[in-house]
Amino acid sequence: MASVGERPAPVPVKDKKLLEVKLGELPSWILMRDFSPSGIFGAFQRGYYRYYNKYINVKKGSISGITMVLACYVLFSYSFSYKHLKHERLRKYH
């Protein structure tokens, strides 16, 4: 047990969350991540479960979780088709 004047032991950079990492530690934190296919799949799976449990699987739910997914879909589809839409917008005659 730590006494009153002692600081708690520092958390290793690998175990820190992204928002807890300082800018000087960021390159070493990124290099410690798992970029294998299973590591990337696990990261997406954790993100999905976090989103699902926070917005979809709640006692008193609302439409906000589904609305965010639809808004992201609209933004991504617009960003992918923007190059095509930009050229059509600049044409004088269709």
Swiss-Prot record:
Its main location: mitochondrion. The modification Phosphoserine is found at S3. GO terms for molecular function: proton-transporting ATP synthase activity, rotational mechanism. GO terms for biological process: proton motive force-driven mitochondrial ATP synthesis. The modification N-acetylalanine is found at A2. The modification N6-acetyllysine is found at K22. It comes from the Eukaryota. GO terms for cellular component: mitochondrial inner membrane; proton-transporting ATP synthase complex. Pfam families: WRW. The keyword Amino-acid biosynthesis does not apply. Keywords: Acetylation, ATP synthesis, CF(0), Hydrogen ion transport, Ion transport, Membrane, Mitochondrion, Mitochondrion inner membrane, Phosphoprotein, Transmembrane, Transmembrane helix, Transport. The chain crosses the membrane at residues 68-85. It is a single-pass membrane protein. PANTHER family: ATP SYNTHASE F CHAIN, MITOCHONDRIAL-RELATED, ATP SYNTHASE SUBUNIT F, MITOCHONDRIAL. Component of the ATP synthase complex composed at least of ATP5F1A/subunit alpha, ATP5F1B/subunit beta, ATP5MC1/subunit c (homooctomer), MT-ATP6/subunit a, MT-ATP8/subunit 8, ATP5ME/subunit e, ATP5MF/subunit f, ATP5MG/subunit g, ATP5MK/subunit k, ATP5MJ/subunit j, ATP5F1C/subunit gamma, ATP5F1D/subunit delta, ATP5F1E/subunit epsilon, ATP5PF/subunit F6, ATP5PB/subunit b, ATP5PD/subunit d, ATP5PO/subunit OSCP. Belongs to the ATPase F chain family. Subunit f, of the mitochondrial membrane ATP synthase complex (F(1)F(0) ATP synthase or Complex V) that produces ATP from ADP in the presence of a proton gradient across the membrane which is generated by electron transport complexes of the respiratory chain. ATP synthase complex consist of a soluble F(1) head domain - the catalytic core - and a membrane F(1) domain - the membrane proton channel. These two domains are linked by a central stalk rotating inside the F(1) region and a stationary peripheral stalk. This is ATP synthase F(0) complex subunit f, mitochondrial. It comes from Pongo abelii (Sumatran orangutan).
